[in-house]
Regions:
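Extended, low-polarity transmembrane helix blocks
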Residues: 1-38, 42-69, 76-145
Length: 145
């Protein structure tokens, strides 16, 4: 199978996962990041800062729209150079609260789904996956770099 096709299929699949995760948060008026952040095991002080009443609405907004826009970007193949790195950062921010450092999780989850997503998103940026059947490719063919 062709490398470009694999990048395209993987980009759209990961995009769908991110879009779905964002939309389910957007349409649920009761959704909040508070439960996830409040249970942070690593860097608890950092994550508890996001729980402050004046900051939590912004945290929720950034989660909902960050995932939704990341999904749209990946599916459309638009701005992948940037959204891949920003998405990887978001995945790392999701990773640390569940990590009970220096202990490894019950099922050896030192590497969990967030790390895999982060690595895949970085690969999308490095290999400019949006240039393959995406708006980045269209923009490049029409306007150059």
């Amino acid at each position: 199978m062709n490398t470009k096709l694999i990048l395209f299929i993987t980009r759209v699949a990961v995009g769908w996962i991110m879009l779905y995760a964002g939309l389910t948060k957007l349409v649920n008026p009761n959704w909040s990041a508070a439960g996830y952040l409040g249970n942070a095991k690593t860097f608890a002080g950092f994550y508890n800062w996001f729980l402050q009443p004046e900051i939590l609405p912004f945290t929720n907004f950034m989660n909902e729209w960050g995932l939704t826009l990341l999904g749209i970007s990946l599916i459309a193949g638009a701005f992948i150079k940037y959204s891949g790195y920003l998405g990887a950062l978001l995945m790392l921010l999701y990773y640390f609260p569940v990590l009970d450092f220096p202990k490894i999780g019950a099922n050896s989850y030192l590497v969990d789904d967030h790390i895999i997503y982060a690595l895949v998103l970085v690969l999308f940026s490095v290999y400019r996956a949006g240039e393959y059947w995406g708006l980045d490719g269209w923009r490049k063919s029409k306007y150059g770099n």
